[in-house]
Amino acid sequence: AANLENDFDNVNEQLQDALSKITLLEEDLERNEERLQTATERLEEASKYIAEDAERKLAITEVDLERAEARLEAAEAKSLEISEQEASQREDSYEETIRDLTQRLKTVSKLQKEVDRLEDELLAEKEKYKAISDELDQTFAELAGY
């Protein structure tokens, strides 16, 4: 009877240890789910921001293009009257537009890299979540074996 009681105590202690592990795994799982949710929300925000920013920049660029086309038509109509100085000023304007568009392209590229980084972070969090879930499943399977 003492041996049976000792075996019972050992099994009970193992059960308590397993329950403690499950509790810790559940807490880890909850934290990882929260991190996954946060990363998903950040990714959605970044994607929305990039899309809105790209639309806004496209609209600005289209307006710039329309203005440039209008200036070009006016310049062609007055091409015989335009002085060397005015041609130089127009060239400066185009260079500024190129610099501006180049800067905008760099900004969009940086934002895309941030989206890529957030997607990578989201994938890593999903893999952590899967590992914890697998470990929890294994612990439950081990408990079922007792």
From Swiss-Prot:
Keyword Repeat set for record: yes
Coiled-coil residue windows: 1-146
Stretches for region Disordered: 76-95
Alphabetical UniProt keywords: Allergen, Coiled coil, Repeat
Listed transmembrane segments: none
InterPro entries: Phage_BhlA/UviB (IPR024405), Tropomyosin (IPR000533)
Domain free text: The molecule is in a coiled coil structure that is formed by 2 polypeptide chains. The sequence exhibits a prominent seven-residues periodicity.
Function comment: Tropomyosin, in association with the troponin complex, plays a central role in the calcium dependent regulation of muscle contraction.
Protein family membership: Belongs to the tropomyosin family.
Quaternary structure and interacting proteins, as annotated: Homodimer.
UniProt name for this protein: Tropomyosin
Species of the source: Turbo cornutus
